[in-house]
A protein has these predicted regions:
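Phosphate-binding site of ATP-dependent enzymes
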Residues: 164-246, 256-257, 261-263
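A conserved helix-loop-beta module that forms one wall/lid of the active-site cleft
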Residues: 95-162
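ATP-binding N-terminal substructure of ATP-dependent carboxylate-amine bond-forming enzymes
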Residues: 1-102
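ATP-dependent carboxylate activation and anion-phosphoryl transfer catalytic cores
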Residues: 70, 232-344
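Short, hydrophobic beta-strand segments that form beta-sheet elements in well-ordered domains
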Residues: 29-34, 132-133, 166
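Short loop/helix-cap segments at secondary-structure boundaries that form the rim of catalytic
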Residues: 39-45, 141-146, 175-178
Length: 344
């Protein structure tokens, strides 16, 4: 079961699982959940179930109901808010059902989710890091930390929400006034042509199964173009970071290669929005984790080192009866309820 299937991360996980069905003859039956019946992923799974938002009291009971009704073996969070919520609920879900919640340990999730702790973790372990300070609501950035340009983003971030490049004091004041939450001001690492996102696939006991490095171009915080990259210096550093972190499933590490080394600014303790691309390249992280958990042999993947990817906008089509049923809370079965036009 994949949660939050309206998100790009969840949809990428679904694509990877479907690719495993095609390429490796798996028999994964994919159940998707979301609080929004309009979410495209609700029409791309084998069964779709409407759920409350993850901070609502009824969320846990609804998940348990779906898991029991469908014999769910693995539960994979597809959004950052659900990553946090399911970290708190994991023990109870696994006690009440036979499912396994695919999550990293709580402390490592917190290291990734708290952007100040991310920088502190890197600093404490001797890795290159961006200078980072906390900004409490109502307080201004200390003058000694005003080295512009700089990045300002929520301390407890979700993707690129709230992130902004700040070029001067007036701009930072206006930006902070928009948010009633803790923020961080972070050193701007200006090496956009040397930006990499790195995938680390972990097994059930923390074994590092494989790594992949992608060089990417961003637009509004999202990967628009990516290519598999050979970067020995980046590879060495992510292996060193993996040796300190305790991983389960996947980590996504983002940073830029500079004269100081590979400066990491994001450690996302979850599957990534580029999970599907990685699967096509040879590293299918959701499938690798599931097979390893089931005590099956997971061979070292052969990565297609020449693969590139460019994203484009697409649509998912479905009929009004299907949409109305989901809107009213009915679970949809009978395979995929929608389709993508084969334009190309």
């Amino acid at each position: 079961m994949v949660t939050g299937v309206g998100s790009g991360v969840a949809q990428s996980i679904i694509k990877a699982l479907k690719l495993a069905n095609q390429k490796y003859k798996r028999n994964y039956v994919i159940i998707g959940t979301d609080a929004n019946w309009k979410a495209a992923g609700m029409y791309a799974v084998d069964k779709a179930c409407l759920v409350p938002r993850c901070r609502e009291k009824s969320y846990l009971q609804r998940l348990i109901e779906i898991i029991r009704d469908n014999g769910v073996a693995f539960l994979i969070p597809g959004t950052d808010p659900e990553l946090q919520a399911l970290s708190d609920l994991k023990e109870e879900i696994e006690k009440e059902t036979d499912t396994h919640v695919v999550l990293n340990p709580p402390d490592t999730i917190e290291i990734g989710y708290d952007k100040f702790r991310t920088a502190s973790f890197l600093k404490e372990n001797g890795f290159p890091y961006p200078e980072t300070v906390c900004l409490v609501p109502g307080e201004s950035l200390p003058e000694e930390d005003q080295a512009y340009p700089l990045i300002v983003k929520p301390r407890y971030g979700s993707g690129s929400v709230g992130l902004s490049l700040i070029t001067g004091p007036a701009q930072i004041g206006n930006h902070l006034a928009m948010y009633d939450e803790e923020m961080v001001a972070q050193e701007y690492i200006n090496a956009p042509q040397q930006e990499f996102t790195c995938g680390l696939a972990f097994g059930k006991d923390g074994e590092l199964l494989s790594t992949i490095i992608l060089q990417r171009d961003l637009k509004k915080g999202f990967t628009q173009f990516a290519r598999v990259a050979r970067q020995p210096e980046v590879q060495r550093q992510i292996l060193d970071i993996a040796g300190v972190l305790e991983g389960r499933g996947a980590y996504n590490i983002q940073g830029q290669l500079t004269d100081r080394g590979f400066v990491v600014f994001e450690i996302n303790p979850r599957f990534s929005g580029t999970t599907a691309f990685r699967a096509v390249a040879g590293q299918n992280e959701p499938d690798m984790y599931i097979q390893h958990f089931l005590n099956r042999t997971v061979p070292t993947p052969e990565i297609n080192q020449s693969l590139c990817m460019s994203r484009y906008l697409n649509e998912y089509y479905f009929d009004t009866d299907t949409a109305d049923a989901l809107r009213q809370g009915e679970s949809r079965t009978a395979g995929r309820a929608g389709f993508v036009m084969d334009y190309f």
